[in-house]
Amino acid sequence: MKRILNMIASEMTNLNKEEFISAIAGSEGRVMACETIGITHPLLTDVTNAEFAASMGADLVLLNMFDVQNPLIQGLPSVEKKETVREVKRLTGCLVGINLEPVDDSIVSENAQDLWSMSEGRRATADNAALAQEMGVDMIVLTGNPGNGVSNDAIVHSLQEISKRVGDKITLAAGKMHASGVIGEGGENIITKEDIRLFAEAGADIILLPAPGTVPGITTAYIHELVSYAHSLGKLTITSIGTSQEGADV
């Protein structure tokens, strides 16, 4: 199987799950993903943020706040809703993933009335995952936006349901870039070896981890230990900058 690094667009956008995982693993940590938000005005006005990310070198575009029941990406040419993801693939030549959020309803969200507020099509349910798979999504990431109340226990529960439904067809990633509004899951408690074990047993193919230095308490040594542990379980990892350092001036 070719590495992502050696693929042309037509090869990269038609991979099955096994090919997707193999192509990433063969690239040995050099695959770049970029998360974009499609519901806001594009940085380049009439060009999608996904295309902008691809032009800057992204191999995989991760669509955040993407509602599979009512898909919207500002700047995208008019297509049928079910063709939204495939149109992003056509325009970018990239792999495409989406975030789904296993919101813990017992945790009060601080985002009920703002841009980040949840919609039904963004929830990490088996039905939404099946819709995503039918739309051509390559990877589903179970994670949480700031303040939405996504706990690691909720991620495990959603993983189990989604894995049973589509786990043989689509790559599943799980983890958090920050505490996501859950008191007690900050710093090193964002993710632990026990969380990784539970995610793996629930069906995760890839473990999402904060990159060293992006969250207080997340050191290079700590993430090195977690990555090594995830690899020992046969899982891939993705480290993320999900706390605004990439947009800072200083």
What is each PLM-predicted segment?
Residues 1-21, 42-43, 70-71, 96, ...:
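Glycan-processing catalytic domains of CAZymes
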Residues 38-40, 104, 245:
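Residues that cap or initiate secondary-structure elements
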Residues 34-39, 66-68:
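N-terminal alpha-helical scaffold/docking segments in eukaryotic complex subunits
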